[in-house]
Regions:
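Non-catalytic alpha/beta scaffold blocks inside enzyme catalytic domains
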Residues: 2-112
């Protein structure tokens, strides 16, 4: 799915991430993994920026790694089921003093 031209463009072959990475069609991979250390980014030669939990399993060292907190452990958050049936508030259990991924992304956007 692409929204590059302002409207949804669905083409399962054209926008297949595995194919795009293999063919080096992207400039960079931005990988967000704040829930589990097992959600590692794909191994690719494309430069990769990772916003992830400490201990995230990485297939290779990314160009940039920014540690972020886990919602419900390091900061408050909200867990939404994929089918949008249930939305659960998550409390900050104070495990670590790591920022929410949303704050990091907002800071990156503000710097651009």
């Amino acid at each position: 799915m692409s929204y590059a031209n302002g409207a949804p463009d669905y083409d399962p072959y054209r926008w297949a991430i595995g194919r795009m990475l293999k063919d080096k069609e992207g400039d960079l991979v931005l990988w967000l993994a704040s829930i589990s250390p097992d959600l590692s980014p794909p191994a690719t030669e494309v430069p990769t920026i990772v916003l992830g939990t400490p201990g995230l399993k990485l297939p290779k060292e990314p160009a940039v790694f920014i540690p972020v907190g886990t919602p419900g452990l390091d900061h408050a958050g909200r867990l939404v089921r994929v089918d949008n049936v249930v939305s659960l508030p998550l409390k900050d259990l104070g495990r670590a003093d790591l920022p929410p991924a949303a704050d990091v992304l907002a800071a990156i956007e503000a710097a651009l």
